[in-house]
Every structure is written in structure tokens, then in C-alpha cells.
């Protein structure tokens, strides 16, 4: 039985550096299989306006010090000091139907943007994970 993905999702393409929630339901372990925050890696590709390239974010520290797990300068989802990491080895394209803004209240949603320094580090981490950087 396959998992059902909601048929709504975003009605617009998110901008590079925006942080959203992605429902990874239907993936297979060791892939991400639940809702996770993600950062949008780039603006839409031509003829692919229904897809977004994202990098998952996590508050769980990596088991090993690897260059594709990037420690961010702040937690973009809360005001606490809990560290946040970009899991750059798990970058992927997802349907906009999997994405939603972050709910902060009754019918209130936000799309925070990652700062440029953190984003540059995430891009480097993705390059390392995909073998584009030595």
C-alpha cells in the first residue's frame, strides 16, 4: 500500500533560501520518511515549476564529523539554542504538493529565509556530498 500525499501543497514556487516543511511520506528507509523542515536550494528550473530542489534540516547532530552535515548558525524554527543541521547528502527534488509553509498559529504561516552565510555553507555541503568538491 502506498502512502497518500495531500493534493494541495504550495500554490507557488518557493524562493531560494526559504525554509518550509516537506512531507517525505512514501519514501523508503534509510531515506527520510516523515515531515521535516527543508531549505530550498534554488529558484525554479525552466519547465520544472512543479518541483523544488530541497535540503532537509534536522536538530539531531550527526554521528560523525562529515562535511555534508552542516551546522547552521541558528535554529530557524524556534527561538531556543538547539542546534540545527543541514543534511546535504539528502538533497533531492520534491513535488510542490509535498511542501507547506511553517504553521505558527491559527491560519498563520511563515516562510523564514536562511541567511546567506549559512546558505553558502549548505551549497558547499551539497557539492561535497555529490562529489563536485574535493
Language model features: what each stretch is:
Residues 1:
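Short, basic/aromatic beta-hairpin or loop at an interaction surface
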Residues 28-35, 40-78:
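Compact nucleic-acid interaction/catalytic patches
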Residues 4, 75-134:
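C-terminal terminal-subdomain/extension
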Amino acid at each position: 500500500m502506498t502512502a497518500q500525499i495531500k493534493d494541495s501543497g504550495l500554490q507557488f514556487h518557493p524562493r531560494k533560501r526559504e525554509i518550509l516543511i516537506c512531507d517525505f511520506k512514501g519514501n523508503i528507509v534509510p531515506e527520510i520518511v516523515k515531515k521535516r523542515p527543508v531549505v530550498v536550494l534554488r529558484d525554479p528550473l525552466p519547465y520544472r515549476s512543479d518541483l523544488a530542489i530541497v535540503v532537509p534540516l534536522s536538530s539531531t547532530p550527526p554521528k560523525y564529523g562529515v562535511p555534508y552535515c552542516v551546522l547552521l548558525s541558528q535554529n530557524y524554527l524556534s527561538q531556543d539554542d538547539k542546534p540545527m543541521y543541514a543534511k546535504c547528502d539528502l538533497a533531492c527534488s520534491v513535488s510542490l504538493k509535498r511542501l507547506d509553509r511553517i504553521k505558527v498559529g491559527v491560519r498563520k504561516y511563515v516562510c523564514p529565509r536562511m541567511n546567506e552565510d549559512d546558505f553558502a555553507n549548505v551549497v558547499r555541503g551539497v557539492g561535497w556530498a555529490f562529489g563536485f568538491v574535493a
